[in-house]
Amino acid sequence: MNYQTFIFDLDGTLLDTLGDLAASVNYALRTHGMPEHSIDDVRRFVGNGVRKLMQRAVPDGESNPDFEATFATFRQHYLAHSLDTTRPYDGIPGTLEALKARGCRLAVVSNKMMAATHELCRHFFPDTIEVAIGEHEAEGIRRKPAPDTVFAALRQLRVGKEGAVYVGDSDVDIQTAANAGLPCISVLWGFRDRDFLIQHGAKTFISAPSELLL
């Protein structure tokens, strides 16, 4: 693959965050007397940011009078526990190191909270990920699938779209890449399966991180 810049999604692409997300969702629901969800439920809920995650998890979503309190409990718990079980997918650290050694530029764009995005990238990828951008709407950067985070990452890397590719695991990532005018590589080890991704327009797939080096 002859790309010089790689823009990665985080959850389900570089990191398996599902266990910690589900634990924090269920802690918040349990704390506020609401029914909990299975990990497969939470897998379906993720992808559009943590507020949307909790809208899907809380009965009646934002219409529930206890929604904001439950959402606040989730945020507090997740920021304290985002490293409990989260780990890079097999092959990710070595692949990032190999790309970096080739002179490639590497960034992360996520709908995750900015603080958690930075913490996870600093913890797991301190020497490879140059730019990490999380939820930033308060500063006028719309969340994915808007292209704003991708454009912000390219600006911070001081590179253009030429030679850049977006790598993600979801329909949101496919839409984000299209909106940013970038090719998209869909990974098959994440939170969505091949059939789902094909239904949402995926064209290029990889089954292992090392395929990015081919």
Model-identified regions with their sequence ranges:
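Helix-loop "lid/cap" segments that line or gate small-molecule binding pockets
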Residues: 28-29, 49-63, 153-154
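Active-site neighborhood of HAD-like aspartate-dependent phosphohydrolases
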Residues: 1-44, 55-58
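Substrate-recognition element of Asp-dependent hydrolases with the DxDx(T/V) motif
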Residues: 25, 92-122
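Substrate-recognition "cap/lid" segment bordering the active-site pocket of phosphatases
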Residues: 85, 113-165, 171-175, 179-180, ...
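Short acidic-hydrophobic, aromatic-tinged amphipathic segments that line or gate anion-handling sites
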Residues: 204-208
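Metal-dependent phosphoesterase signature
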Residues: 55-94
